[in-house]
Amino acid sequence: MALKFHLIHQSKKSQARVGQIETSHGVIDTPAFVPVATHGALKGVIDHSDIPLLFCNTYHLLLHPGPEAVAKLGGLHQFMGRQAPIITDSGGFQIFSLAYGSVAEEIKSCGKKKGMSSLVKITDEGAWFKSYRDGRKLFLSPELSVQAQKDLGADIIIPLDELLPFHTDQEYFLTSCSRTYVWEKRSLEYHRKDPRHQSMYGVIHGGLDPEQRRIGVRFVEDEPFDGSAIGGSLGRNLQEMSEVVKITTSFLSKERPVHLLGIGDLPSIYAMVGFGIDSFDSSYPTKAARHGLILSKAGPIKIGQQKYSQDSSTIDPSCSCLTCLSGISRAYLRHLFKVREPNAAIWASIHNLHHMQQVMKEIREAILKDEI
């Protein structure tokens, strides 16, 4: 079945809202944080049963083991042993971000042009790119992207779009926006020929240009997409991103769920949720964990610091994650990182992912009380 979005409460203080997205594999309480399982797995975490929605990357699964192989094994849910909702992207994000730099990198002011090492050629038909695994030259069109996502079998899928960096010149920027909406329309048409249990979000582009964002919203809302995703360049810092998201959501109707693509660090979530964003995806908590940055209510903990060498307390006394309930001390976790024990990233990732889910629960409770 296509997803159903239920609005439970609209805050009286802002555009923040609490809702539920109903899919054939379960219900997602919103606002929700969506961890990224790049290759169909969360790095350092085996059990993802308590995570309501998981984001898998079509690009990486396209290169290995291949969507057809996954389809023969029953689709991603059976392949991964997951009986809860999954969202996949189009593959375009990785193609273009490997060439240009990602949206998150731009927000951190390091979105410098990388060159075209992976991206070979863009035409109106699609994108040619080189596999980072073996150098093969591959082609991805809107139809091929959707078919790959059909084979993977995710609950929510994304149409092919072109991700542009902040530094693009105006002429190419406008050309790209137009081409992206043609690609999205082709993607939607292909999807609707065989919708199965899947739903498709339309992606809104437009960079920092309010008029182009308005055009993007109008395009997505005029087409029968099941949800809206805010994509494209979001600026170079949190302030610019806030302006982009505020402008974009001001044009959106309230009937569909709204996802913010590629953004999911805590400062951004706190800043964006008031604009009515329903879900955020990011590899932030697991990536931070692998680098020894531990999330806690009192603020991030850089576990490698000397001051934790004799700290026998758990990461967060109020936390109910497996790491904290197992009595893993800060001193022990620091030791594991210092000796490069693989368990360090595992314990840290389990905690960080649980922390993100708890933060989202607290955000939903605050919205219900009209505190956000």
UniProtKB/Swiss-Prot annotation:
RNA binding: region residues: 262-268, 286-290
Coiled coil start-end: none
Keywords (A to Z) from UniProt: Glycosyltransferase, Metal-binding, Queuosine biosynthesis, Transferase, tRNA processing, Zinc
Active site: 89, 281
GO MF assignments: metal ion binding; tRNA-guanosine(34) queuine transglycosylase activity
Binding of substrate, residues: 89-93, 161, 232
Organism: Chlamydia pneumoniae (Chlamydophila pneumoniae)
Domain of life the protein comes from: Bacteria
Pathway(s) it belongs to: tRNA modification; tRNA-queuosine biosynthesis
EC number: 2.4.2.29
Required cofactor(s): Zn(2+)
Entry keyword annotation includes Phosphoprotein: no
Family recorded in the similarity comment: Belongs to the queuine tRNA-ribosyltransferase family.
Subunit structure: Homodimer. Within each dimer, one monomer is responsible for RNA recognition and catalysis, while the other monomer binds to the replacement base PreQ1.
SUPFAM superfamilies in the record: tRNA-guanine transglycosylase (SSF51713)
Reactions the enzyme catalyzes: 7-aminomethyl-7-carbaguanine + guanosine(34) in tRNA = 7-aminomethyl-7-carbaguanosine(34) in tRNA + guanine
GO terms, biological process: queuosine biosynthetic process; tRNA-guanine transglycosylation
Residues the entry annotates as binding Zn(2+): 319, 321, 324, 351
Name of the protein: Queuine tRNA-ribosyltransferase
A Pfam entry, by short name: TGT
Cofactor: binding comment: Binds 1 zinc ion per subunit.
Function: Catalyzes the base-exchange of a guanine (G) residue with the queuine precursor 7-aminomethyl-7-deazaguanine (PreQ1) at position 34 (anticodon wobble position) in tRNAs with GU(N) anticodons (tRNA-Asp, -Asn, -His and -Tyr). Catalysis occurs through a double-displacement mechanism. The nucleophile active site attacks the C1' of nucleotide 34 to detach the guanine base from the RNA, forming a covalent enzyme-RNA intermediate. The proton acceptor active site deprotonates the incoming PreQ1, allowing a nucleophilic attack on the C1' of the ribose to form the product.
